[in-house]
């Protein structure tokens, strides 16, 4: 009898989580083609934890943010997914966590672009982000401050505020040649500041920057500055295959 009760409780909890995710949506959202020659090329979570804005961004790049994957983990779909930019201005009724906003962004593009994707998991070379033998050197973020600004690149590294280790690992994946999996078991949110040489990494640099060659490698920087380490390993990597996508009508809100 106790087993039956426990199973029922687990099923009820799973159902509640799935329902909560299914009902996460922005209160107001505008999705439209970007103006020809428009400037921007950026998608970001706005201060206040209620709003996502994209300016002049193709669907493929929007997907990397919504699903927390790198560009190399997305395949398929029509050619315009890579080449035609869109503007998005989406606002939630109340402040949300970053994870919830990402789910809301997923639901938005799945609805507006009639997006259908298939997940494909492959066992590939990865880096595991682990705590180095000397222990972590990461400032814990003030739990009373709920703002989640996105991590940003700087001329000689990157900075992030209120960052989980899982999201930090994803950010590292975007600039390295393989996916990074969080194995730190560090549960808090942290303020991260990392200085390293960008030269030879996958960070976009429109104009040659002499500072890109300055500083330690990212592997050395992680050890010396944060007490973390990238350990080569093999692990599961999630790939998204676009099976269907349609352009949204103009001025859809």
What are these regions (language model features)?
Residues 2-253:
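Beta-strand-rich assembly/attachment modules of structural machines
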């Amino acid at each position: 009898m106790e087993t039956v009760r426990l199973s029922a409780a687990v099923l009820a909890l799973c159902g509640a989580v799935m329902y909560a995710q299914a009902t996460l949506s922005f209160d107001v959202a505008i999705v439209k083609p970007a103006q020809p020659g428009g400037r921007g090329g950026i998608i970001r979570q706005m201060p206040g934890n209620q709003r996502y804005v994209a300016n002049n961004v193709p669907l493929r790049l929007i997907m990397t943010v919504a699903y927390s994957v790198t560009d190399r983990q997305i395949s398929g779909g029509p050619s315009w997914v890579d080449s035609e930019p869109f503007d998005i201005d989406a606002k939630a009724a109340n402040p949300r966590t970053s994870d919830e906003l990402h789910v809301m962004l997923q639901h938005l593009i799945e609805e507006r672009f009639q997006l259908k994707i298939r997940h494909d998991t492959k066992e590939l070379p990865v880096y595991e982000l682990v705590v180095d033998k000397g222990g972590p050197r990461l400032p814990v973020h003030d739990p009373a401050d709920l703002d989640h600004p996105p991590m940003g690149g700087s001329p000689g590294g990157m900075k992030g505020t209120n960052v989980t280790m899982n999201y930090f690992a994803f950010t590292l994946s975007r600039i390295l040649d393989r996916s990074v999996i969080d194995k730190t078991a560090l549960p808090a949110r942290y303020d991260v500041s990392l200085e390293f040489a960008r030269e030879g990494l996958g960070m976009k640099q429109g104009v040659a920057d002499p500072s890109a060659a300055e500083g330690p490698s990212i592997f050395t920087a992680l050890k010396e500055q944060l007490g973390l380490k990238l350990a080569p390993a093999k692990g599961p990597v999630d790939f998204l295959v676009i099976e269907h996508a349609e352009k949204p009508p103009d001025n859809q809100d």
